[in-house]
Amino acid sequence: NLDTPYCFYSGDYGG
């Protein structure tokens, strides 16, 4: 998601 530091990693890592 856009509320996580990994949102840009794959697309939806954190949720």
UniProtKB/Swiss-Prot annotation:
The protein in question is named Antioxidant protein SmP90
State what this protein does.
Has strong superoxide anion radical-scavenging activity (EC(50)~16 ug/mL).
Further information in the entry reads: Has an apparent molecular weight of ~90 kDa.
Q: Which UniProt keywords apply?
A: Antioxidant, Nematocyst, Secreted
Compartment(s) where it occurs, according to its Swiss-Prot or TrEMBL record: Secreted; Nematocyst
Q: Which residues form the signal peptide?
A: none
Q: Out of the domains of life, which is the source? A: Eukaryota
Can you supply one Gene Ontology CC term for this chain's record? extracellular region
Does the keyword section mention Secreted? Answer: yes
Which GO molecular function annotation, any one, does this entry have? Answer: antioxidant activity
* Record keyword Secreted present: yes
Q: What is its main location?
A: secreted
